[in-house]
Amino acid sequence: MSLVSISEGVRAGLVLKRHVVCFTGTSNDQGLKSISDLLSHMDNPAVPSPQSCSIDSLPDTETQNGISCYLVPYSGTAEIDYELQNRFALWLHKSTVPVILVLQDNPLMIPYLRHQFWFACGEDMGQWQDSVVAESIVDSVYMHHSIRRYILDLIVHLRMHRLSKPSQGGGAHSRSLSDMTLLCKWIALTSGSSFITPDMVQTACERYFPWHLQLIESSKEDPSVMYGSQEELVDELINRFDTFAIKMAQEYKNPLFKQLCIVQSVMKDIIPAT
């Protein structure tokens, strides 16, 4: 019930040039230092050191040559101005350099910005291992059409889950299929396989969707109340689930524990296509 280690998440992001989120469980300053120390163990001297920046002063996307990645701290205690979030999201969309977002807790964030990041990892640092996987060989991994259908089934059922926010499609956005496919191929390659299995899809699902899911916060967002569900019972269910999730998030050091529960409940109901 824990997130993948920071070392594994960062390694995937650097190799495949994707933005990732790191929950460090510490202050942003300490988190930046810990990840910088982790990246210092890379054995390739040709790879330049990461560069730190803030969302208030983002570097020009036209001058990103010679940079391995950006380390960006993000406050999760208060919602950042909408315009600033939107500007940050547009910058991420244009950036050809992977960004590592350093967080202490699950932040208040607009969906468009959240979806610019591939997946979340942490709080365990793990051990750095230099990758033998290159971006150029990812497409060599075979994916059977039944695997693609399995991923689509999971996406549909996550969107339709009772606790998923209908207005946001539950957070399973339009790039979910391509993002999941890439993550499945990465898992296959790092496992020494040339094809994707249903187990790999489930592993990818647990890594990818918790960061993206958008869940309802009250009965006012639950469409079932229009068909007879009692608002007070829906609110009680949500409140009890929130209380349980907060307790377990601390135990497993996983700020996305509640979202992971939703993902796992959906996976139990979906049988891989044959």
Swiss-Prot record:
Belongs to the MTC2 family. May be involved in telomere capping. This is Maintenance of telomere capping protein 2. It comes from Kluyveromyces lactis (strain ATCC 8585 / CBS 2359 / DSM 70799 / NBRC 1267 / NRRL Y-1140 / WM37) (Yeast). The lineage of its organism: Eukaryota, Fungi, Dikarya, Ascomycota, Saccharomycotina. The gene is MTC2.
